Amino acid sequence: MRKETSKMKIEVLFPEVANLYGDLSNIEYLKKCLNNDVEIIETSLNDEPAFVKQDDINLIFMAGMTEKSQEIVIKKLKPYADRIDELVSKNQPVLLLGNAMEILGKFIENEDESQIRAVGLYHFYAHRDMFGLFGYTNGARINKVYVRIWWTFAQITQTLNFNNIGTVIG
């Protein structure tokens, strides 16, 4: 008798704007690695994120985006800040690539020192600079975020039965 397995469920947030470096191809690759035994939920900017009401999502994924798109996504996610914090506190795997992580900080500072208020979950801010990047921390919780990202990579590779020989966060 074959044991029934449930599909892995991945929510991809805002694929219409969060695909700056073609990162959605990684989701397609993952789907093939899992022999299509995965359910992909693509949440557009016009939709309520599935993570708001569903507790069975295995991974929340968002890729990098343009600076203008960051501002749109911040407005979209701010109403769900408490829910995001709740899920992260419960060790919900969340994979944010590129500048998507900046959205969860306190603010994003432009080159002219003007600030864009971000979702505000973590005590760090990002600084936009044409010729360099980046993140500055003014609180200890940023370390917890990075540790959680590393843990998430390890958990994903173990869950998928991949041999994790090293993880690079760029």
What is each residue range found by the language model?
Residues 30, 40, 60-62, 104, ...:
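Generic structural hydrophobic/aromatic packing signal, biased to beta-strands
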